[in-house]
A protein has these predicted regions:
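Conserved AMP-binding/adenylate-forming core of the ANL superfamily
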Residues: 15-19, 39-91, 95-99, 119-121, ...
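Gly/Ser/Thr-rich phosphate-binding loop
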Residues: 175-180, 291-293, 303-395
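Conserved AMP-binding/adenylation subdomain of ANL enzymes
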Residues: 226-242, 250-291
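Structural core segment of the AMP-binding/adenylate-forming
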Residues: 106-176, 284-289, 293-313
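Conserved pre-ATP/AMP-binding loop-to-beta segment of ANL
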Residues: 35-38, 162, 167-168, 179-227, ...
Length: 568
C-alpha cells in the first residue's frame, strides 16, 4: 500500500534521504556477509514476562526464521497489504515479525500490551486488521485471553496467533513455526520476491494532534528508516555495536529508533523488559550494552548506579523527553564515555534529537531546517511556528511563539485509511505542507548572524492529559467516567507526582449516593473492559465540576480540591 504522494517520493528520493531497499533486503545482506555474528538476544527473564523462552539468534538463524515464517503465512493465504496487529514485548520475535512483514508486504500494527478489550477492538476496527499476533501474557496482563475475546466478536479477524506457553484454546501456536528454521530449504534462501517496494507502508502507529482523537499513521520503509538514520547519525551506531532496546513496539522509539535502526546497520540487539533501574544496569554490565535509550527523568538516578566499567563501555545515551519541557529539571552531569543525546517526542508524529551541548539547551529546537550532520545539504525535517508573526506583531505580548508545524522525510501527509476506505484522511496542514501538531511553543532566541532561532515546546494547545508516559484527551475520559449510571457528572484530571515523575490520573465524580458510588464506579470500569491506563488511581467526590463559560473543565481547580481532600 502506497500512502506517500508521487511528489514526496520524487523529492526525498532525489535528495538521497529515501532509497529503493526494503528493510528485509538490508538485513538479508548482513545475514549473507556475517551469518554467524549474533543479531538478536532476548532478555533472560522473558519467560516470566510473556511465557516465551528467551532466544539468542545469529544473523543467519534470524533470516532462516524469517523465511520459514513467510512460507508458512503464504501457505495459509496471507497476502500483501494484510494488516496484522502485533501485541508482543520487545524481543527477538518482534524483530523477526518486522522482517517477515517487510519481506511479504504485510502491514504491522503494533498495539500496546496493556490495551483493554474495548481499546483493542477500536484499534483493530480502525485499521481493518485481518490477523493478530500476541504473546500469551505480559506480566499480569492476560493479553492472549483479551485478544481471543475480541477476535471472537469480530468476523473480520481471520487468524489469531500466539507466542508463548499457556495460551488459551483457539489460538494458533506460532512458537513452533518460529523455532522451525531448520526446515527451510537452502536453495533460494536469499531469493527476494517483489511483494512490496520501499515506499510501501510497513507499520502503523497511533498519533494525535492535540484535541483530535488518536489516528493510525502508516509509515513506509523509507520513512521508518529515515527516523532511525536521523537519530543514529548522532549516536554513531554501527555493525560492531550492541544496542539495548527496552521501549515497546507500539511507539516510534521502540520500533523505529530501536529495532528498525539496528536491523538497518546490522548492530546486535539486546532486548530488555524494563522493571527496575538496578536490573537494567545489571543487564548492561552483563551483555555489554553500548547504546541505550532512557526517559530523561531517570538519568540522574541511572547515572548514580552505573559501575565504572559500564560507564566506559557506553557510546551513546539517548534521553527521551515529552513535548513539554517547561517544568523539567535537567541533570547535567555525564561521567561516562558516552555522548548524551536529548530526544523530544512529538506524540509519535515526529522525533527531534540533538547532541547535548549544555543542559540549559535541552528542549530548545532550531526553527527552520534540521540538517544532516554528515551531509548538511540533506534536510531531515523542517519546523515552522504557525501564528508566530501575528504573535510578534502584538506589542503587549510578553511571549513570541506559535503552534509547531512540521514536515520532512519521516512524516506522512495522511492517516492510514480507515477500514473500508481507499485513501487516508489528510492530516491538517498549512498551505506549504507543514503538518499541524497543536503543540504550543515560544521563541527562545531570535536569529542573529550564525545563531539559529530557537524555540521551546510549552505543551498541548488542546485539552490533553499526560500521565505515566501516556496521553489521553480529557473530554474522552470525562465521557467515559460520566457514562456510569451512578454518576451525574465527571471529569478526569492529573495530580503531579514528585519532580520529573509521572503524574497520577484521578477522577472527580458528582454523585447522589457517595456511600456506594466508589464500588459501583469501579465495577462499571471493569465491565467496560477498558485499558488499565484509563483507570484513575483514586476518585474524589465534588458537588459540581468546575467549568468555564464555554464548558471547558477547569482541571486545575480539581487538583486543588484533591489536595484539600488529601486524596492525591
Amino acid at each position: 500500500m502506497l500512502l506517500s504522494t508521487p511528489e514526496q517520493i520524487e523529492t526525498y528520493s532525489s535528495s538521497g534521504l529515501w532509497g529503493e531497499d526494503r528493510l528485509d533486503l538490508v538485513f538479508a545482506r548482513h545475514a549473507e556477509q556475517r551469518p554467524d555474528d549474533l543479531a538478536l538476544i532476548d532478555d533472560q527473564g522473558l519467560h516470566s514476562v510473556s511465557g516465551r523462552r528467551p532466544q539468542c539468534l545469529s544473523f543467519i538463524r534470524t533470516w532462516r526464521r524469517v523465511v520459514a515464517l513467510c512460507e508458512f503465512l503464504a501457505g495459509i493465504g496471507m497476502k500483501a497489504d494484510t494488516v496484522v496487529a502485533m501485541l508482543v514485548p520487545p524481543s527477538a520475535d518482534a524483530a523477526v515479525l518486522t522482517l517477515v512483514a517487510s519481506r511479504m508486504g504485510i502491514i504491522l500494527a503494533p498495539i500496546p500490551l496493556t490495551s483493554g478489550e474495548a481499546d483493542l477492538r477500536e484499534k483493530l476496527e480502525q485499521v481493518g486488521a485481518k490477523a493478530i499476533v500476541c504473546c500469551s501474557h505480559y506480566e499480569d496482563e492476560a493479553v492472549a485471553e483479551r485478544v481471543r475475546n475480541v477476535a471472537a466478536e469480530m468476523f473480520s479477524i481471520r487468524f489469531v496467533f500466539c507466542i508463548g506457553e499457556n495460551a488459551p484454546e483457539g489460538l494458533i501456536d506460532l512458537g513452533d513455526i518460529l523455532d522451525g528454521e531448520d526446515n527451510v530449504d537452502e536453495d533460494g534462501l536469499f531469493d527476494h520476491g517483489g511483494q512490496a517496494n520501499s515506499n510501501s507502508v510497513l507499520a502503523i502507529h497511533w498519533s494525535s494532534a492535540g484535541s483530535e482523537q488518536a489516528r493510525p499513521i502508516g509509515r513506509s520503509h523509507n520513512q521508518l528508516l529515515a527516523i532511525g538514520r536521523y537519530i543514529h547519525e548522532q549516536t554513531d551506531l554501527s555493525a560492531e555495536h550492541c544496542s539495548f532496546v527496552n521501549h515497546h513496539m507500539s511507539g516510534l522509539i521502540g520500533f523505529a529508533v530501536g529495532v528498525v535502526a539496528a536491523l538497518d546497520v546490522g548492530a546486535r540487539i539486546q532486548f530488555h523488559n524494563f522493571r527496575t533501574l538496578g536490573r537494567y544496569v545489571d543487564a548492561l554490565a552483563e551483555f555489554g550494552g553500548q547504546h541505550v535509550v532512557l526517559p530523561g527523568g531517570l538519568w540522574q538516578e541511572a547515572h548514580g548506579l552505573l559501575p565504572m566499567h559500564v560507564r566506559e563501555q557506553l557510546i551513546s545515551i539517548i534521553l527521551v523527553w515529552n513535548r513539554e519541557h517547561a517544568e523539567q529539571t535537567v541533570f547535567g552531569e555525564n561521567e561516562t564515555a558516552a555522548r548524551l543525546i536529548d530526544l523530544t517526542n512529538f506524540k509519535d508524529l515526529a522525533l527531534f534529537s540533538q547532541i547535548r551541548r549544555h543542559p540549559s539547551e535541552v528542549g530548545s529546537i532550531p526553527l527552520g531546517s534540521i540538517n544532516s550532520l554528515r551531509d548538511p545539504s540533506l534536510v531531515w525535517m523542517e519546523t515552522f511556528l504557525y501564528g508566530m508573526e501575528e504573535s510578534r506583531a502584538q506589542k503587549d505580548s510578553s511571549i513570541v511563539g506559535g503552534e509547531l508545524c512540521l514536515k520532512g522525510a519521516m512524516l506522512p501527509h495522511c492517516a492510514f485509511p480507515l477500514a473500508g476506505a481507499v485513501e487516508g484522511k489528510a492530516l491538517s496542514a498549512t498551505e506549504d505542507g507543514f503538518i499541524h501538531t497543536e503543540i504550543g511553543c515560544h521563541l527562545v532566541t531570535e536569529e542573529h548572524g550564525d545563531q539559529r532561532a530557537l524555540f521551546r515546546p510549552l505543551g498541548d494547545l488542546g485539552d490533553v492529559l499526560a500521565f505515566g508516559g501516556f496521553t489521553e484527551r480529557g473530554e474522552d475520559l470525562d465521557a467515559l467516567y460520566r457514562a456510569c449510571i451512578m454518576v451525574s457528572d465527571a471529569a478526569a484530571f492529573v495530580v503531579p507526582s514528585g519532580e520529573n515523575s509521572p503524574g497520577h490520573l484521578m477522577a472527580a465524580l458528582v454523585v447522589d449516593d457517595k456511600e456506594n458510588a466508589r464500588e459501583e464506579f469501579f465495577a462499571y470500569l471493569r465491565d467496560k473492559r477498558i485499558s488499565s491506563m484509563k483507570w484513575p488511581r483514586d476518585i474524589i467526590f465534588v458537588e459540581a465540576i468546575p467549568r468555564q463559560t464555554n464548558g471547558k473543565v477547569m482541571r486545575e481547580s480539581l487538583i486543588e480540591a484533591s489536595q484539600v481532600a488529601d486524596v492525591a
